Every structure is written in C-alpha cells, then in structure tokens.
Amino acid sequence: MEQFHGTTILSVRRGNQVVIGGDGQVTLGNTVMKGNARKVRRLYKDKVIAGFAGGTADAFTLFERFEAKLEMHQGHLIRAAVELAKDWRTDRILRRLEAVLAVADSKASLIITGNGDVIEPEESLIAIGSGGPFAQAAARALMENTQLSAKEIVQKSLTIAGDICIYTNNNLTIEELNDEGK
C-alpha cells in the first residue's frame, strides 16, 4: 500500500518569539486525501509546540510518545527529545515509524528524526517535509533581509512553499510561543 506523505513544517525563532507552522494537505500517492489536517499543535501545558512531517498515523503515535516523555520529564524539552530518540532506536515498533518532528519551547528548537537523531538547527530555523527546502530558502531570505516577525516569516515562507510544492497547500496552522523574559 502507498504511504501518506508530503507536507511542509517550518519553525522560526526570532527575538523572544518562536513559531512553528505547517500546511494542511494529506496526500496518498497522487491524490489529495485531506486539505485541512492539523500537523502543528501545542503540548505540555501549552509550553511546547510541535509539528510533524511523514506518515500521519506514525506522527500521531510519536506525538503521544513525545508528550508522555514531556510529562515524565516535567516539560524539559531536550531531555524528553533524547529519551524519545533512545526509544525510537531500540523499540521495534517505533523503528518502523516514518515521521520527523519539529519541536520547540521558549529556549530550544529541535528536530527529532526517524533514525532517532536529535538535532538542534543552526540559525534558529527548521524546515522539514517535501516543501521544506522551499520554505527554508524563503525564510532565510526573509530573516536576513527584513525585520518581519517570526510569525510573518513563517506565514510568507509557507505560502511560497505551497505555491511551489505539489504536496503542500496554503491551509496553514501556525502556533507561537513568546518569552517575555528575553
């Protein structure tokens, strides 16, 4: 059976704001199955935001596991991500899941990959999924050449990716965290 795939998730951190946004398209082969999926959500008492690219059912399984790790480690993002990655590498069922998570709190942004890797990106920018390269290029240009907010950069970059990538649409879900202490 063909795999559900294709999406674009973008995270930008600028100033005291971190934003993760994603499109709403779910594709099976060359057919759009759903146009308004919610691939970005808030976790752990609204202190963590996360988005996924990859198989939808796989991603929901990972969201549940990641949220359980956040609860276990009292919202400590890096510790929860590392523990999930350890499980991902050693659990026979998890190893078969095909998804990538982009997660962020007020202090850190991380990519958790299907290989069980935890990566902290350079330049406070994460772009995953089929439209990721388009969104990343747009976001980098906007970050370097404008004073737009993180939310505006995510919106504009995802719109550009949606105009280029056939697996990405412009039905966006955007979540943001503001750290007033910075």
Curated annotation (Swiss-Prot):
Catalytic activity, per the record? ATP-dependent cleavage of peptide bonds with broad specificity
Q: How is its activity regulated?
A: Allosterically activated by HslU binding.
What's its EC?
3.4.25.2
BP terms from Gene Ontology: proteolysis involved in protein catabolic process
| Disulphide-bridged cysteine pairs | none
Q: Catalytic positions?
A: 7
* GO MF term (any one): threonine-type endopeptidase activity
Q: Can the keyword Cytoplasm be found in this entry's annotation?
A: yes
Query: What GO CC terms are in its UniProt record?
Result: HslUV protease complex; proteasome core complex
What PROSITE patterns has UniProt attached to this entry? PROTEASOME_BETA_2
The protein's superkingdom reads: Bacteria
Keyword Hydrolase found: yes
Chain residues that bind Na(+): 162, 165, 168
Q: Which UniProt keywords apply?
A: Allosteric enzyme, Cytoplasm, Hydrolase, Metal-binding, Protease, Sodium, Stress response, Threonine protease
* Compartments in which it is found: Cytoplasm
Entry similarity comment: Belongs to the peptidase T1B family. HslV subfamily.
Oligomer and partners: A double ring-shaped homohexamer of HslV is capped on each side by a ring-shaped HslU homohexamer. The assembly of the HslU/HslV complex is dependent on binding of ATP.
**Its function?**
Protease subunit of a proteasome-like degradation complex believed to be a general protein degrading machinery.
Q: Which NCBIfam families match?
A: ATP_dep_HslV (TIGR03692), PRK05456.1 (NF003964)
Which HAMAP family does this chain map to? HslV
Stated name of the protein = ATP-dependent protease subunit HslV
Lineage start: Bacteria, Pseudomonadati, Pseudomonadota, Gammaproteobacteria, Legionellales
Gene symbol of the encoding locus: hslV
